[in-house]
Amino acid sequence: PPVRVLEVGAGTGPVTRELLLRLPRGSQLVVVEPSRGFTKRLRALADTHPEIKTTVLACRLDEVEPSRHRFHHIVSSLPFAIFHPDQVRQTVEQMLNQLVDGGTLSYFAYRGAQLRIAITPRGPSRNQQEAVQTYLRQVHHQHHGTTRSAWVNLPPAVVRTIRT
């Protein structure tokens, strides 16, 4: 059956491309990407899959009007590691609030993030990175999340999925 999917931080569209190929016919895909240069490319990509109703929004997630229709799945490629902890918390909460009961939120992180934190000199930057990782671990644990590695990605990534 068709599903509603929100993709946040689509960039040049590698995840968008896979979603368009894998979503059931008649599904709805909402893509949020603040870079207008990327959104032009994303719209062209969406046009190659008319069987999926795709909306590409050139804005940040916090600028999107909350939908009265919730999503079955949300995929985020946002680089949480470089965000302020409050921004990560607000963004994750906003995404979780947009999910149907039993919906999933998947997000990416790069393998080696802990190593990067460990070699960062003590100070505000390291504290911020540690706070983000601590928060994401808490959310992951609270929602009984799963983790899998994407070794073919360069650099290798971790895909974390939580269910509401």
Give the residues covered by each predicted segment.
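A short glycine-rich, Lys/Arg-flanked "PGG" loop and its adjoining helix->strand segment in the class I
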Residues: 89-101
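Conserved SAM-binding strand-loop segment of SAM-dependent methyltransferases
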Residues: 50-61
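Class I S-adenosyl-L-methionine
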Residues: 126-164
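A short SAM/SAH-binding and catalytic strip from SAM-dependent methyltransferases
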Residues: 72-87
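Conserved class I S-adenosyl-L-methionine
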Residues: 2-11
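Conserved SAM/SAH-binding beta-strand->alpha-helix loop
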Residues: 35
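Conserved beta-strand signature within the Rossmann-like core of class I S-adenosyl-L-methionine
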Residues: 101-111
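Glycine-rich SAM-binding Motif I of class I
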Residues: 13-17
